[in-house]
Structure formats: structure tokens, C-alpha cells
Swiss-Prot record:
Protein name: SCAN domain-containing protein 3
Species of provenance: Homo sapiens (Human)
UniProt keyword Coiled coil, yes or no: yes
Entry annotated with the keyword Nucleus: yes
Coiled coil: 246-275, 542-568
Length: 1325
């Protein structure tokens, strides 16, 4: 601990930005989720530390009284310790950790807090590791460049640590191979501790030995570290890991051999053989992936002891390639090498760490057409530090120009956010894409509000993207830190006063990707600070008050500059700065403000804030001391001279460029003499050829020149004005095959007219450029390592065997993938349209060919002809599509916890019993209904056979469990809902909590069937009349002609089906509408029936029946459809019951206004109608209907009783709840949550709301979702039967209905890429 304390005073209050190993593998370019997780952890740690400080620094004067002070302290303590997620032991550990950090020396406290320790043990480990590293003896190191040994004390003395840093980095630059055209400035670590720790982490080597092409990477040390890290990785994994120990590896080989030898195999043997196989390689048994016949590629399994050697050799063979290249090479040959193992190895590879620490992701500026086209909108939560009624900050940034706007908000309601955005849009214009890290729902609501306020505005919600220079989370946290810093400095809580200055500071930094600041990018000019940006002195500016005085001051300044310029001309002094000032025509020149007037200064290298004490001697830019290189030609007495790394790199590249130019052979003088004859316009090109050896320096110099911000940095541009636009000209030649290449396993083949190498082991044909020993050897060692040690005679024998065998086609010629995908895309609509399969070839294909031949030509028609669309092909495609949809459905159900079923059976055209089953489950923040499966029952439809069909599919095929089935809905048939052996009863034995529901629509139809004798006689008479006319074709034609002559609205009567009782409503309505036409027609045919239409009492009963049946038809239609819930159905039934009760009361007062047809008859006939008898008949019928509805829909079984909180949890009444006391308390808490209330009002469906509330209130949401998952009717099964009757007709009675039925009824989109990747395309037969 003392050694640690001795080092930390050197920090001088500066905390390093990075601790531990300074060189890490950068995976930001390949996997952004790592950065997001680390940013989230930093945000949580910062929030907890801030809460702790606020708790400790809380003052009694900040509150109006003692009760408020105590309440505020409790809230701050809760925010710090988080008792909701921490146990008592964890809270105690946090208190001990705080006290432990307090007793540490001040130098150690800041360093330890940077590591965000979670417990005291982590602090002890950090301090012990640091003490151990600082107490280790310094070893002697050898410098390969100078051939002499230098100790660590001699190489990095304490007095000149920073001075030696520049010299060592210069020597490192001389040895490094340039790998990127972009400059890589030194890291701003701000202390000698960083330099010391970096030296130790590199094992004591000199910094100049940082060579990315170094071959020695200490494999033995890497091996030991790799296996230790691998052991820790496997401890955190489950038993189902892909990495095998050697014992497990040998055991698997033994089990696979035993399984293959068994004559009668068990299920476990089949599963094992489906994954593994064993082959013999050079006398050793190897475990490989089972070959399924679709591919002949062999992929090996590795055990843990061979893992490091494979990774190490592959990494060296690809020249220290990154994770993507290693993954591509390894996974092509090995089955169980994962990304985690590859990344584990890469973190131990020193050259990769050194290389990636210098490489940066290239930042590219967006084109001008994307300005104000995409914006980032986020909300900064300031509820813990409100400024009056303002509790949030709107952070708006244009992702192209990086222009930032900040607005204070009172709430986070979408309406207020939209008004603040409109204020910004009226300044810079509205974007096309709006993205936000506050969630898709928030963005959608804001876009919707913007559209309501400004209808012409069209903005879409974009996918989340990070900014090029800094992520939105980091920017938000940076703004929050600036606000808290200002509040503490000024001892004020009114942060809205400083918000405008924060906005300006965000728009002032220089962005290297854009080569300018956000203000300059957006407005083509730097942000002005009045006359503070002028060339006038401060005293003169302070004395100016009018524009006339300003004009006079400008004239005097111009005269002064001109006099100085003329004086410099006479004396021969450099006057470039004065020339620039004289060439400025505006009255206020474009010049950077003095350092004394800048509110925020930034380093020109790292773009971070700096004090402005140090400046570059070349470009006069503000820099950190660590970001510069000490000048070697500084004069005595002038102090230490510093050059920024950008200028230093520019001068270094220029020096190397000049040295190489001087080393080139001298060309003849006539080639150097410029010609006086210009080229003709047709011979002038837009590029010129340069020597290949100079291209790097030309591009490097051009890249550095783009970062300059003054004319002094561009001093060399005049000599090479167009070098940045030059192109490298590669020599084009064909490599020849050498017979010695056979020892690498390659022979020569002719591909077209080019000679190419072909591997005799795997048959891969490489490019002609790969015909050289290094690349051929790389292929051999990376893909065929097991035979890499074989002698030359082995490969010659393999070559002879290959030539003696029939010619094998290794590389399959181009296959018509487009034709294969086209066949799938045609098969899908054929199945959706429920048409015969032959239509694809006989109609669709011929029509497409004719259209292509007419519009695109014969070549396009020939391509269409290649698409396979025969009858059998379409059948196979539909089967594959159905299987893929089924696999996706099963995966989605397994992801959801609960599901419910809807089942029914019917008889098809071939007298086969078809069982249809639908499923409802949670998916994508909503409840989804899908066709589950269909099954054919060849014999009886007993409950046992139905149950076995359901169980075999759900349990055996899908691997689901019935205990997660929360409900089963059927039509009430005996085989479904009998008292003893029904399907539902057997399912409830496996799932006791499963609820059974009888179809609401079916029960409503049953309730309508009870009718009085008088009304039933009217129905019978109507049926006879309809059958008399419709059964005789002559009567039907004569009646149609009569209706036409009488100009009736309808010309035909309608038939009804007895099984569909409510279909009589349309028959009765049609009969009532053309009653006069029927009276005329029946007078000559059936006079007895014509008397019925003359009887006003019979006609009144007909009118009533047509009215009441039409009303219940409407009710029946409203109960049909998808995504209906148990509660919506119960609401409609209860509403109809209350209507019947009200109608009954109105009838007693002779009010018939609710029956329109009956009211028409009463108004027509007047007193001829026996109104008393009619009142009795209707009242009796309405009473029977109420009794039937109460029988089929008992009030005591109303699902809403005790569950009304599910429909609206924010109701004031919380009585008669089917909840425990604990859940009732949670419901009361939910009802007062304003955020959820807003979400409830804006959510489209009730299930979506409860799914969103599941994170905060899981118990309540689970109860609600179980009831919302229940099917209220068998509507989906009925629509499925209709589809079944269309697909399987008497002409297609032998069709296997299951595959086309799934494709026609399912809403899941098939994965065509996956289907086509498993098949080999071929032309149509």
C-alpha cells in the first residue's frame, strides 16, 4: 500500500481516463452491443455515486421544514442503496465500502472510484494488484534497433518521463509499418502513472519495439493465460457448452461408435448420430459433425487441450487478422469454436492489442444532401433536480452536422415534445427520419403529434444509430455533468439559465470527421460572439457604441495593417499574416477569438477541453502536454517548445517522402523538362500514374493536410496540389505454376483462359494471384493441418489418383437461385388463393412468359421458362413452405409462457373427419392468433381419439407442456365437453388451471331457437312459400319477371339452412320487402297463401320476426372476427340482455319504435290490427329470449365479475376483486401510476398494455394475460372449415389437405433464404 501511495502524488490531481492494461482489442467496429453494455454500466455507476454524494451533502436549509427534510433524506438514501434490488448484506457492504474508501489516501480514492468497485473485496484486489505490479523488479530489456540493453530506470527516468515519451514514440514511428491513412494521435492519459503502467503491461519492453508484424508473441505465456481465462469462462456457462474436455471428447467418440454398432438403436442413439460421427485421420479417431447428405464438407470437433494450438496457428496464418477473418477460417472447418473463444484469444495477442490500440474507425462525413435529414431526439431526466416546473431537457441533434439544440420541458408528454421540436424545425427545417433512444413508442407518439399539428409534415421513425463521434448516451451524460458542475459552482438550482450556454458549447468543438464545427457545417460560418470575433482590441471594442464608430475603427485598422505591410515589403520581412488580413473584405474578419475570451477551449488533437496553457509552435493550436511532442530545436531561454502530433506526423511524412525521392534514380533531363505543347482535349484524363512506392506517402500527407486549420500546416500543398487524387496503377500479369507447388497440395487447372491453383484435397480453386508458396501454404495449414506434415510423395500420389478417377466437378457451376426463389414465390400465392396446383404451369407461367416476351424481349421470356412450376414441384414447394411456417410457429410458442387452444371438427368431401386447432399466445408485445395444426381422424370421433390427436401433436411433436395451456374453447359438442370422457376433461387433468369456454356465437344461436307456436307457424308458412317458388324453375323465372315488371328492389327469394338458424333473418327481411309482389304472384298460383299477405295480423308478426332476427343477426356478426376477448364478448351479451329488458317494458306501453318494419305495418293498417294480441305475442317472445339468454349466459358466470380491473385498472372502484390483499395493494399502486395511465390511453389493445406492464407488475399482468388469452368463440375454426371446403373439392378429394391448409390459413411469412440455401437449384424440366 505504501508503494501505491508513493506513486499517486505524481498524478497532481489528474485522474487517468483509462486504467489497467492500456491496449485492448477494439471490437467496436464489429459488435456495437459491447459498447452499449459498457456505457450502461458507466451510467448506472455514475448515477449511484451521484446519489451517494447528494445524500451525504444534503443540507437542512434546502427544505421548508423537518418533515420534508426527513422525507428527502429517505428518498436520497433509497436512490443510493436501492433496497428494491439489494439485499441487507449488499446494503451493509455498500456502507462498509464507503467508509473504506473514506479512510484511503486522497490520491488512491479517485483512482479506485474510477474502477467502480461493487464491494470492499474488489477494492482490496485492485490495491493489491497495483502494489504487486509496482513492487516487481524491473527487468533488463534489449533494443533490437541498437543492439544494447537498457534498464527500465534508464529508459524512463522519473524526471524526464514525458520528454522521453516523444522520443520513444518517434523511434516507434520509424519502425512501424503504416497501416491506415488516418493519423493516430497519442492518448491523453495525463499522468506519469499511465506511462509506468503501460511499460509494465508490455512486459518491460521498449516502446519502440511496438511492431505489429512481430512474430514472437510468447505462445507459452499466452497458453497459460488462455486456459485460465477459458476455465473462468466455462464456470459461468451451463453444462450444455460446446467446449469439451478431453475426457468428454473420448467418451463421445466411444458412445458414437457404440451407437453405430447397435442393430436396434434407441432414441438417444439417433440423437447422438444426428450430431456426431467418427472418422480415422492418420491413425487417430476424430469426432466430426454428422454429414447429412446435403453437403460433403467435414467439420471437426475439438477438445479443450487442442483449442489453443488451432487458434494460434490459424491466427498466424492469416497475418493477425481480426475476429471476422478468424471466425470465417475456423468455423469452416471446426464445429465447436465460438465467437467468445476467438475473442478470448484475441485479447491475449499482444501484436493485435498494439495494432488495434492505434487503429481508429474511420470517420466519414455525410454528403450535403443528408443535412437535416436524420435527427436524434432524447430526453434528459432532471426530476431529481427540477428548476421550478421544468423537469426534463429535450436534446435534439442533427446527425449529419452534429448541430445540437436543448430545450427545457415541463413533462415528457408527446404534445409538449412535439411543440418544442416545431420550434427547432422552423429554424433549421424538419428531418425525414427521427430516431430516439427513449423507445419506439415514444418516437411514434411524437411523430403522430407532429402530424396532427402540422399535417403536411411527414416524418418516419428510424432505427437506432450511434453518432459517428460520440454515442447519444455519452452526449446526454456529458450534458448532465456540465449542468451539475454549473449548479455546484454557482450554488444554484436554476439550470434553465445556463442551458443556452451548454447548447453553444456543444456546437463549438471541432469534429475531425466533418473537418469543421457543427455551426460551420450547418451555417457555413463559425458562431459569432459580437465584436469579440473582430480584429479590434478589447479596449477599442469596449469603447464602441454606434455603427459609425465601428466603421471608423475598421478604417483605422486597415490603414495600420497596410502601413505595416509596406514596411515589411521594404525590410523583406514575412507579411503573409498581414496579406490575409488585408484580403478580408467584410468589416468583421473571420478570425478565431482570443484565448482569453473563449469560454471553452479544445485540444486540436483529441478534441477534449484543455486549459489553453500549451500551444503548438507550428499551427498555434491549443493542445494538452501529453498530446504534443517536445521540439528538439528549441532555443534556450524560450522554455520547452511543443509540436502537436498532427504537425509532427506531417513533417515526418514529408521528410520520408523527400528522402525516398532523393534515392530514386535520376531521370533524363529531357523527361524533366516541361513541354510547351499542350495536350489535346481528348487526351487529357482525370488521373495520372504515380510511382507505386510513393503512393503511401502521398496519401498519408494528403490525409494529414486535411486536418490542418491554418495556412502554416498547408505549406507543402503547393508542391503537390493533386497528389490526393492520384490512383495506384497495379501491374497486371499472370503467375505461372511451378511443379514444386505439389508439396503444398496444389495442381494447376485452366479456368477459362487463366491458369489457377486447385487443392487436390478439398478441390478449392484459388485465384491466379494466390499462386505463390506463402498463400498456398496458408491454405494447407489452415484447412488441412492434419496432413500438412505429409511428404511430397503423398501429394503426388493423391494427384495421380485424382487424374485416374472420373473427372470430379468440385466447383458447381452457377445455379439458378433466382428461378428457385421464383418457384417458391409463385407457390405461396397459389396456396393462398386455394386454387389447383396446375394453374401455376398452365396459366401463371404462360402469362408471365407472354408479358415478358412482349415487353422485355425473348431473353427475359427464356429466363422465365426456366422457373420450375410443374404440378409436383408446386406441391413440394407448398409442403416445404408449410413445414417452415410450422417450425417458426413452434419456436414462437416456446418463447411465450402460456397459450390457449380453440378446436373443432368437421367432415370433408371424402367423408374424412378433420380436426382443426388454433392457438393464441403472446408475441411481439401483443397477443397473436395462428392456425396450429389439422389432423385426420380415419375412424370414430370419440373423445379419446380427439384427445390422442391433440396430445400427440402438442406434446410429442412440438415438445410443449399442457400445464402452460390456460384455456380450451369448443362449440359444446358431446365429444368435446361431455361430462365424463370429453377432450376438455382429459386436458384439465394435465392442466388443472385450464379454463373451458363454450363458443359465445354458438350459444347466442341456441338462445334464439326458443319461439312461440304462433310465431313458429309464421316461419313454417314462409318456408313453404319460399320452397314452392325456388324449387320450381318455372315459378322462379316467372316470379323474377313479375318483380322486374313491378320495379321491385329484389327479384329473387333467399334460401336458408336449418343448421344456421339465424340465416332466416335475411329470408324474412327479403320476404317482407317484396310482400306485395308475392301477393300478386300467389293469387293465380296459390290463392290460400295469398290470403296470408292480406291478413294484417300475420303480416305484423312477419314484420316483427324480420326485425328481431335482423337485430340478432347484427349481434352475431359483431361477435365474429379475430382478436376478440372474453370481456368484449361479455359486454355485448350483457348489452343485449339489457336491451331485451327495456324492450319488454316499452311493449307494455305500446311503444314499437325499436322494430322498424313492425312500426311501418302499424302505421299502414291503423285500427285494423289487433294490437292487444300482438302485444301479448311479442312480450311472451321477449320473455322467452331473456330466459334463454340467462340460461346460456348465466350472470353468475360472467367473466367480468371481480375482473373489471383488467379492462380498466384505473377505475375508482376497487371493490369485489378476485385478488389477494397483496395484489390489491399492487393494483392501487398501479392505478396511481401516471406514466402507465398515459400508456393505457395511447395503447391500441388491452393485451398490449398488460404486456408492457409486466415488467413493473408481473403478478397482476400474469393474471390479466391468462384471461385475455382465452378464445371466446370458434370463429377461426369455422373460417378454417370454409377454406377447407374450397381447397378440397370433389375434383380434388384425394388431396393431402394439411400442407395447403396451413399455408392458406397461416399469417407467418416463410423464410425463403433458409429454404433455398438447403436446396440445389436446377432448371425446369
Amino acid at each position: 500500500m505504501e508503494a501505491v501511495s508513493r506513486v499517486f502524488p505524481a498524478l497532481a490531481g489528474q485522474a487517468p481516463e483509462e486504467q489497467g492494461e492500456i491496449i485492448k482489442v477494439k471490437v467496436k467496429e464489429e459488435d456495437h452491443t459491447w459498447d452499449q453494455e459498457s456505457a450502461l454500466r458507466r451510467n448506472l455507476s455514475y448515477t449511484r455515486e451521484l446519489s451517494r454524494q447528494r445524500f451525504r451533502q444534503f443540507c437542512y436549509q434546502e427544505t421548508p421544514g423537518p418533515r420534508e427534510a426527513l422525507s428527502q433524506l429517505r428518498e436520497l438514501c433509497r436512490q443510493w442503496l436501492n433496497p428494491e434490488i439489494h439485499t441487507k448484506e449488499q446494503i451493509l457492504e455498500l456502507l462498509v465500502l464507503e467508509q473504506f474508501l473514506t479512510i484511503l489516501p486522497e490520491e488512491l480514492q479517485s483512482w479506485v472510484r474510477e474502477h467502480n468497485p461493487e464491494s470492499g473485496e474488489e477494492v482490496v484486489t485492485l490495491l493489491e494488484d497495483l502494489e504487486r505490479e509496482l513492487d516487481e523488479p524491473r527487468q533488463q530489456v534489449s533494443q533490437g534497433t541498437y543492439g544494447q540493453e537498457v534498464s527500465m530506470e534508464e529508459m524512463i527516468p522519473l524526471d524526464s518521463a514525458k520528454e522521453s515519451l516523444g522520443t520513444q514514440l518517434q523511434s516507434m514511428e520509424d519502425r512501424m509499418e503504416c497501416e491506415s491513412p488516418e493519423p493516430h494521435p497519442l492518448q491523453d492519459n495525463g499522468s506519469f502513472l499511465w506511462f509506468s503502467m503501460m511499460s509494465q503491461s508490455m512486459g518491460g519492453d521498449n516502446l519502440s519495439s511496438l511492431d505489429t508484424n512481430e512474430a514472437e508473441i510468447e505462445p507459452e505465456n499466452m497458453r497459460e493465460k488462455f486456459f485460465r481465462s477459458l476455465a473462468r469462462l466455462l464456470e459461468n456457462k451451463s453444462n450444455n457448452t460446446k467446449i469439451f474436455s478431453k475426457a468428454k471428447y473420448c467418451q463421445l467418440i466411444k458412445e458414437v461408435k457404440e451407437a453405430k454398432a447397435k442393430a436396434k438403436k434407441e432414441s438417444v442413439d439417433y440423437r447422438r448420430l444426428a450430431r456426431f460421427d467418427v472418422i480415422l485421420v492418420q491413425g487417430n479417431e476424430k469426432l466430426i459433425e454428422a454429414v447429412n447428405g446435403e453437403t460433403d464438407k467435414i467439420r471437426y470437433y475439438l477438445h479443450s487441450e487442442d483449442l489453443f494450438d488451432i487458434l494460434h496457428n490459424t491466427h498466424l496464418s492469416i497475418g493477425h487478422g481480426g475476429r471476422t477473418r478468424m471466425e470465417k477460417e475456423l468455423q469452416a472447418k471446426y464445429k465447436n469454436i465460438t465467437k467468445e473463444v476467438i475473442m478470448l484469444y484475441l485479447t491475449l495477442c499482444k501484436p493485435c492489442q498494439q495494432k488495434n490500440s492505434k487503429l481508429k474507425k474511420v470517420l466519414t462525413s455525410k454528403s450535403i444532401k443528408e443535412v437535416s435529414s436524420r435527427c436524434q431526439v432524447d430526453l434528459i431526466d432532471m426530476q431529481l433536480n427540477p428548476d421550478g416546473e421544468y423537469r426534463f431537457i429535450l436534446h435534439y441533434q442533427d446527425l449529419c452536422t452534429k448541430l445540437t439544440f436543448l430545450r427545457s420541458l415541463k413533462s415528457k408528454r408527446p404534445t409538449e415534445v412535439a411543440h418544442a421540436l416545431l420550434d427547432i424545425f422552423t429554424i433549421i427545417g424538419a428531418p425525414s427520419v427521427l430516431q430516439s433512444d427513449n423507445g419506439r413508442e415514444f418516437s411514434s407518439q411524437v411523430v403522430s403529434e407532429l402530424s396532427n399539428i402540422w399535417p403536411e409534415l411527414k416524418i418516419v421513425h428510424g432505427k437506432s444509430q450511434t453518432c459517428q463521434s460520440q454515442s447519444s448516451a455519452e452526449q446526454t451524460e456529458d450534458i448532465r455533468k456540465r449542468i451539475f458542475s454549473w449548479m455546484q459552482t454557482n450554488n444554484s438550482s436554476h439550470w434553465t439559465e445556463f442551458l443556452w450556454f451548454i447548447q453553444m458549447s456543444q456546437n463549438q468543438p471541432y469534429h475531425r470527421s466533418m473537418q469543421q464545427t457543427p455551426c460551420e457545417s450547418a451555417f457555413s460560418s463559425e458562431a459569432k460572439l459580437g465584436l469579440s470575433h473582430s480584429q479590434l482590441t478589447e479596449e477599442l471594442v469596449a469603447s464602441l457604441h454606434t455603427e459609425n464608430e465601428l466603421d471608423q475603427a475598421d478604417k483605422e485598422l486597415e490603414n495600420t495593417l497596410r502601413a505595416q505591410y509596406e514596411e515589411n515589403i521594404e525590410t523583406g520581412t514575412d507579411s503573409s499574416d498581414i496579406e490575409e488580413n488585408l484580403s478580408v473584405t467584410p468589416k468583421v474578419a473571420e478570425k478565431s477569438p482570443p484565448e482569453s475570451r473563449l469560454r471553452f477551449l479544445s485540444c486540436v488533437v483529441c478534441e477534449k477541453e484543455c486549459t489553453g496553457v500549451n500551444s503548438c509552435i507550428s499551427c498555434d493550436g491549443n493542445i494538452h502536454a501529453i498530446c504534443g511532442v517536445p521540439s528538439q530545436h528549441g532555443t534556450e531561454g524560450c522554455g520547452r517548445q511543443i509540436t502537436c502530433s498532427l504537425c509532427y506526423e506531417t513533417s515526418t511524412m514529408k521528410r520520408k517522402h523527400d528522402e525516398i525521392q532523393r534515392s530514386l534514380p535520376v531521370k533524363p533531363s529531357k523527361m524533366l523538362k516541361p513541354s510547351g505543347t499542350p495536350f489535346s482535349p481528348d487526351k487529357v484524363g482525370d488521373w495520372m500514374a504515380k510511382q507505386a512506392s510513393l503512393d503511401f506517402f502521398v496519401k498519408k500527407r494528403h490525409a494529414f493536410s486535411e486536418h490542418s486549420s491554418s495556412n502554416k500546416r498547408n505549406v507543402n500543398n503547393r508542391s503537390y496540389p493533386e497528389e490526393g487524387k492520384t490512383k495506384r496503377v497495379h501491374a497486371s500479369f499472370t503467375r505461372k505454376y511451378d511443379p514444386s507447388y505439389i508439396e503444398f497440395g496444389f495442381v494447376a487447372v485452366i479456368d477459362g483462359e487463366v491458369l489457377k491453383p486447385q487443392c487436390i484435397i478439398c478441390g478449392d480453386v484459388l485465384a491466379n494471384e494466390a499462386m505463390k508458396p506463402s498463400k498456398l501454404k496458408r491454405h494447407l495449414y489452415s484447412k488441412h493441418k492434419e496432413i500438412s506434415s505429409q511428404p511430397k510423395e503423398f501429394f503426388e500420389r493423391k494427384s495421380s489418383e485424382l487424374k485416374s478417377q472420373p473427372k470430379q466437378v468440385f466447383n458447381v457451376s452457377h445455379i439458378n437461385i433466382s428461378a428457385l426463389r421464383a418457384s417458391y414465390k409463385v407457390a405461396l400465392p397459389v396456396a393462398k388463393s386455394k386454387t389447383p396446383y396446375t394453374i401455376a404451369e398452365t396459366l401463371v407461367k404462360d402469362c408471365i412468359k407472354e408479358v415478358c416476351l412482349e415487353m422485355l424481349g425473348e431473353s427475359a421470356a427464356k429466363k422465365v421458362a426456366q422457373v420450375p412450376l410443374s404440378n409436383d414441384t408446386i406441391a413440394r414447394r407448398i409442403q416445404e413452405l408449410a413445414n417452415d411456417m410450422e417450425d417458426q410457429l413452434i419456436e414462437q410458442i416456446k418463447l411465450a409462457k402460456y397459450f390457449s387452444l380453440q378446436l373443432d371438427e368437421c367432415r370433408d368431401i371424402a367423408n374424412m373427419i378433420i380436426l382443426l386447432v388454433y392457438v393464441r399466445f403472446e408475441h411481439d408485445d401483443d397477443i397473436k392468433e395462428e392456425f396450429f395444426f389439422s389432423a385426420s381422424l380415419p375412424t370414430n370421433t370419440t373423445s379419446s381419439e380427439l384427445y390422442e390427436a391433440v396430445k400427440n401433436y402438442i406434446v410429442n411433436k412440438c415438445g410443449l407442456e399442457f400445464k402452460f395451456c390456460v384455456g380450451v374453447c369448443s362449440d359444446g359438442a358431446a365429444s368435446m365437453t361431455g361430462k365424463h370422457s370429453e377432450v376438455v376433461t382429459q386436458i384439465k387433468e394435465l392442466a388443472p388451471e385450464c379454463k373451458t369456454t363454450h363458443c359465445f356465437i354458438h350459444r347466442e344461436s341456441l338462445a334464439m331457437k326458443k319461439i312461440s307456436a304462433e310465431l313458429n307457424s309464421v316461419l313454417n308458412d314462409i318456408v313453404k312459400i319460399v320452397n314452392y317458388i325456388k324449387s320450381n324453375s318455372l315459378n322462379s323465372r316467372l316470379f323474377s319477371l313479375l318483380c322486374d315488371n313491378m320495379e321491385a328492389d329484389h327479384k329473387q327469394l333467399l334460401l336458408h339452412a336449418e343448421i344456421r338458424w339465424l340465416s332466416r333473418g335475411k329470408v324474412l327481411s327479403r320476404m317482407f320487402e317484396i310482400r306485395n309482389e308475392l301477393l300478386v304472384f300467389l293469387q293465380g298460383k296459390k290463392p290460400m297463401w295469398s290470403q296470408l299477405f292480406k291478413d294484417v295480423n300475420w303480416t305484423a308478426r312477419l314484420a316483427y320476426l324480420s326485425d328481431i332476427f335482423s337485430i340478432f343477426n347484427d349481434l352475431n356478426a359483431s361477435m365474429q372476427g379475430k382478436n376478440a376477448t372474453y370481456f368484449s364478448m361479455a359486454d355485448k351479451v350483457e348489452g343485449q340482455k339489457q336491451k331485451l329488458e327495456a324492450w319488454k317494458n316499452r311493449i307494455s306501453t305500446d311503444c314499437y319504435d325499436m322494430f322498424h318494419n313492425l312500426t311501418t305495418i302499424i302505421n299502414e293498417v291503423g285500427n285494423d290490427l289487433d294490437i292487444a294480441h300482438l302485444r301479448k305475442v311479442i312480450s311472451e317472445h321477449l320473455t322467452n329470449l331473456l330466459e334463454c339468454f340467462e340460461f346460456y349466459f348465466p350472470s353468475k358466470e360472467d367473466p367480468r365479475i371481480g375482473n373489471l380491473w383488467i379492462q380498466n385498472p384505473f377505475l375508482s372502484s376497487k371493490d369485489n376483486l378476485n385478488l389477494t390483499v397483496t395484489l390489491q395493494d399492487k393494483l392501487l399502486k398501479l392505478a396511481t401510476d401516471e406514466g402507465l395511465k398515459i400508456s393505457f390511453e395511447n395503447t391500441a389493445s388491452l393485451p398490449s398494455f398488460w404486456i408492457k406492464a409486466k415488467n413493473d407488475y408481473p403478478e397482476l399482468a400474469e393474471i390479466a394475460l391468462k384471461l385475455l388469452l382465452l378464445f371466446p368463440s370458434t370463429y377461426l375454426c369455422e373460417t378454417g372449415f370454409s377454406t377447407l371446403s374450397v381447397i378440397k373439392t370433389k375434383h380434388r378429394n384425394s388431396l393431402n389437405i394439411h400442407y395447403p391448409l396451413r399455408v392458406a390459413l397461416s399469417s407467418i411469412q416463410p423464410r425463403l433464404d433458409k429454404l433455398t440455401s438447403k436446396k440445389q437449384a436446377h432448371l425446369s424440366h
